[in-house]
A protein has these predicted regions:
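Catalytic cores of alpha/beta
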Residues: 26-53, 139-141
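Conserved anion-binding
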Residues: 46, 50-124, 128-129
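Intrinsic disorder and flexible coil segments
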Residues: 5, 18-21, 29, 58, ...
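Alpha-helix-loop-beta-strand connector modules within alpha/beta enzyme cores
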Residues: 10-31, 67-83, 134-141
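Glycine-rich, proline-tolerant flexible connector loops at the mouths of alpha/beta enzymes
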Residues: 1-18, 57, 123-135
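Generic internal hydrophobic packing segments that stabilize the cores of diverse globular domains
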Residues: 16-19, 23, 39-47, 63-66
């Protein structure tokens, strides 16, 4: 899985040439995520040799994107990445925009919804453990 987390932060298109170069050298199924906001971008990325696309913030903002992508490309090609942070009381909350904005969603309900909409895989990411070298959030799992 190749995630360009800066694409979301910088509100820019994916770097298609970079994706093409990585896909050309990758001899295993490749998943790309970062800055993907619509099916037109997905079509370009799949055409470059990527097998799966991960969406995160857009899965919250535009849930229809999950359904549309699954319908066009197949459930196996759509991955939803869910960012999780604990609040001051230790409750797990869904966050978007690289862990900067609380989406105000119930985690379990959202997981069920994205599965129903057609996500073939769901990746849970503990934003609290990003870049701190503490390993997996076992309690979250």
């Amino acid at each position: 899985m190749f995630l360009d987390i800066d694409a979301c932060l910088e509100n820019r298109e994916p770097y298609y040439k970079m994706i093409e170069n990585i896909a050309a050298e990758c001899f295993m199924p490749l998943c790309y995520g970062g800055g993907v906001k619509n099916v037109e971008q997905m079509k370009k990325i799949y055409a470059l040799g990527v097998e799966k696309i991960a969406i995160s913030s857009q899965a919250v903002i535009n849930r229809n994107l999950i359904k549309e992508a699954a319908s066009l490309f197949g459930n196996q090609s759509v991955i939803v990445t869910i960012g999780i942070k604990k609040d001051v009381w230790g409750k797990k909350k869904v966050y978007i925009n690289n862990g900067k904005k609380n989406a105000k969603l119930n985690l379990i309900d959202f997981i069920k919804e994205v599965e129903f909409l057609g996500a073939g895989e769901i990746v849970i990411n503990s934003c609290d453990n990003d870049r701190v070298m503490k390993g997996y959030d076992i309690d979250l799992l």
